[in-house]
Each structure stands twice: as C-alpha cells, then as structure tokens.
C-alpha cells in the first residue's frame, strides 16, 4: 500500500540540500567543501554551513506544510512508500523585512533562481475542470447518470522532488502541481485587437499556482482559494487512479493500494471528487463508490475553534463546482437518513450534524464532510483528540465511536535537532549513541545522566555558544548589541 498525503501548503524549504546532507551524515566541517562544489556546479541557492539561509519556514509555506515535510522525512526513513501532493507555488507567502521595528512584507520569489531538486514530468499532466453545468441521462443499462460539462479548464503539470530516508535506501516523492492553461493564446481575440483577452485564459489558469494563501477577503479571492483546493486534489486523485490503470488494477481496489491522509480540511474536496470520478467516469454504483471512498480517506483535524472550521458558501460551490455540490447534497441526504433512523425525532441533532448550514447564507461544513467521508479521524495530540470527541465532534463521536482516534503529530529529530542544533546533537550522541536520530524515544536514556556534572557543564557550554552565535547574527544584521545573559 502507498501512503498519500494531501497538503495544500508548501512543504519543503529552500535549504533542501542541507536537509539531504544531514540525512547522509555530512558533518559540519565538510559542509563548506560541499558548498563550494555545489556552487561550482551551478546549484542555485546552495548556501551551507555558516552561510546557510536563515528564512522563517512559516513565512514560506505555513505550519501545516512544515508538518507535512516532517511526515515525508519520517515515512522515507521508516521505508514506507509514500507520496506527498501539493501545489508548486511560484511565490511563497512573503519575505519578511524589519524596518524601524515594523514588519514589511515583500514578494517571496523563491523560484527565481530555479529549484535544482525538482524534476518536471509534463508527460503526466492532468486536466482539471471548473464551472459549467451538469446534465442527466440514462446509460446503456438504463441506469441514471450525470455528466459534468465544465466551461473552464486548467492543466496540472507535476514536478517531482525526491525525499530521502535517513541511512536507508528508500526515496519517497513529493509531487507538486504547476497550473498551465489548456489554451495559452487566443489568436482570434488577438487579431481583432483584444490583446488582454488573447492571454486571459493563460493568466487565469496560471494564477492557480501563483501564491499560497491568496487574500480571501474578496469574492475573487475566495473563488481562487476554492479553485486551488479542487485543482490539486483532482490532479492528485487522477494521478493515483492512473497508476492503478497502468497496472491493470480495478478501481474497486483503490483503498488496497492508496491510503489518503487529509491534512486539515483544505483537501476535503477530494471526497466528492473521488466520488465523481468513481460514479460518473468509472460508472460504479453509489454504494460501491462510497465504500471505496470511506476506506480510502483519513482526516487530521488541526483546530478546536468552531469559527475556524472551514466552510464554503453553497452559491460559490454552485458556480465553481456544480457537480461536486450535487454529490455533497447526496452524501448529506443519505447520512442524515442514517442519523434520523438512529435518533428518530431529534431535529436539533440533524441540524447540528448536517453537512449543510441552512439559512440565508447557506454553506457546506468541510469538517463535517471530512468526518463523514473518512474511516479515521484524529487530532494532533492526546488532549486535542479528546476535546474533539467531547466538544467539536461530540455528535459524530456518538455516531461513529470507532472512527475517532488519538494519533499524536510529531517532528523529525533529523531536521529539528541534528540539523538545527548540531553541537547539541553531537553531545547527545557522545553519551547515548546515535540511535536517537532514528528513534527519538531513546532520548529518555539521558535521564541516567541527570546528575552527571560533566554532561551538565558541556550542555551549558553548547547553550552559551548558540547564544553567542545568535547575538553575533543580530549584531551583524541589525547593528544591535544584545547581552547573551538576556537570552
């Protein structure tokens, strides 16, 4: 089985080479030699050791993206086959400057020098539709069918980035989708003098992979975010289904070969999109398609705030994804029938558990869709998962008690200890060996040295040295003297 991780945020930083070298155990004194060799080979942005780039990860791809990067590193190290899917954004969130004590955001052109670790795969591009209309018909066997006729299309071109495991021969893959136009230039519009119209489709399609987190304070911004979400989940699902087709595996066996993790609600449109493909394209029955869908997906929730749980307006979904809205309505109708059967007469419970918020501004609760369409739901910690069951999804926990579990998120020690603090990592290895790099639970053996004065002295020396380095950097970049005793 292949683990598949859907994550809209950017998931790897520009210091990918440094991460890779850390996995290969290239030590700090040798990094400067590697840096010179990389620059000689023309590797863009290869700055290592003391010249290592100092960029805030959150300003580039978001916390969820950083978490996804840790998962991919861990999966590769555990030698578990996995693919991480996302969007190949042309711009990050922003580059941060501090002027007169205030944050100033400037365009983050992180791809301006190219990215040597990615491999374009244009022969594996996918077509994605938006808007349009639906029409119903009867197939050759007299079954009721629906056909979606989009009026807008984009092409998703995959770019693959290798993710190497630590001290193993496993290489997993990050596949990022770049948006291209199906028609890049309209000669007719150009010839009649409509120069903007001649490239309108190209600009509109390529906007899908321009920037992470477009401003959703406007109708156009919200529409772009929705289209981004559908774009990358549609491309990713098509890619998975294509891999089965190439091996002659029937779509009914999809969950036996792909386990899809929804990292928060941003990829939840994958549920109606997979249903659409299975029903409308592969022509499965609803029951077979739904059992396949639920067996495929698992959902990780990242927030306990009800107001922060993602919702999309029905009006917007109807304009951008009309067929998907129909499928969501059908999922909701069938689900509420089950709730009604188990809790007859409890109208308030039906209202609370419905996927659709009724009223003047009707909307779809994406978190409810994720819970109903997945076979497993977890929070990011033991406490978080318990609060989900007792508060946020209490009704769903009563209805699907076997569906909720506590699976704690974590970080990779290779990135956040061995690479981030090499002197401390070396000190730990000196006393307990290097097994902790693959098994973080081995750090517990440090408790045996809790009263070891020699280790305590060396530990404090490492901390002091790191403070000196930070104070020097602040002085070099900002001209501000800082006492290390204040850190």
Predicted segments, located by residue:
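Periodic, rod-like helical contexts
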Residues: 16-18, 26-31, 38-39
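A conserved ligand/cofactor-binding region detector
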Residues: 1-6, 10, 23, 35-36, ...
């Amino acid at each position: 089985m292949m683990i598949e991780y859907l994550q809209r945020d950017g998931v790897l930083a520009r210091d990918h080479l440094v991460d890779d070298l850390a996995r290969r155990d290239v030590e700090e004194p040798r990094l400067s030699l590697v840096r010179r060799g990389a620059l000689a080979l023309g590797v863009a942005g290869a700055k290592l050791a003391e010249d290592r780039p100092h960029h805030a990860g959150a300003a580039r791809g978001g916390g969820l993206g950083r978490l996804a990067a840790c998962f991919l590193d861990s999966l590769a190290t555990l030698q578990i086959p996995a693919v991480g899917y996302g969007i190949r954004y042309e711009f990050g969130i922003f580059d941060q400057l501090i002027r007169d004590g205030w944050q100033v955001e400037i365009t983050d052109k992180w791809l301006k020098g190219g990215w040597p670790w990615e491999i374009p795969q244009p022969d594996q591009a996918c077509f994605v539709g938006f808007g349009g209309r639906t029409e119903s018909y009867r197939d050759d066997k007299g079954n009721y069918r629906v056909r979606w006729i989009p009026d807008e299309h984009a092409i998703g071109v995959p770019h693959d980035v290798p993710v190497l495991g630590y001290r193993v021969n496993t290489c997993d893959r990050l596949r990022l989708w770049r948006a291209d136009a199906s028609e890049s230039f309209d000669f007719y519009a150009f010839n009649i003098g409509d120069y903007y119209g001649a490239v309108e489709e190209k600009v509109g399609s390529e906007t899908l992979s321009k920037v992470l987190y477009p401003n959703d304070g406007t109708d156009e911004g919200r529409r772009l975010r929705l289209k981004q979400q559908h774009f990358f989940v549609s491309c990713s699902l098509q890619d998975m289904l294509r891999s089965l087709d190439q091996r002659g595996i029937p779509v009914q066996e999809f969950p036996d070969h792909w386990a899809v993790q929804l990292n928060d609600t941003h990829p939840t449109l994958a549920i109606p999109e997979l249903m659409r493909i299975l029903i409308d394209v592969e022509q499965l029955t609803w029951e077979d398609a739904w059992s396949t869908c639920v067996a495929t997906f698992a959902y990780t929730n990242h927030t306990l705030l009800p107001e922060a749980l993602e919702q999309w307006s029905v009006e917007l979904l109807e304009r951008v994804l009309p067929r998907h809205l129909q499928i969501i309505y059908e999922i909701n109708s069938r689900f509420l029938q089950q709730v009604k059967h188990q809790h007859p007469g409890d109208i308030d419970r039906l209202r609370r558990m419905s996927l659709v918020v009724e009223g003047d501004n009707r909307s779809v609760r994406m978190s409810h869709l994720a819970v109903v369409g997945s076979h497993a739901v977890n929070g990011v910690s033991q406490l978080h998962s318990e609060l989900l069951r007792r508060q946020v999804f209490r009704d769903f926990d009563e209805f699907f008690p076997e569906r909720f579990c506590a699976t704690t998120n974590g970080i990779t020690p290779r990135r956040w200890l061995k690479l981030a603090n090499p002197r401390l990592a070396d000190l730990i290895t000196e006393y307990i060996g290097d097994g902790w790099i693959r098994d973080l639970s081995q750090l517990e053996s440090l408790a045996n040295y809790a009263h070891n004065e020699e280790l305590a002295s060396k530990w404090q020396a490492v901390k002091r040295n790191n403070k000196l380095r930070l104070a020097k950097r602040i002085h070099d970049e900002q001209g501000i003297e800082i006492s290390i005793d204040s850190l």
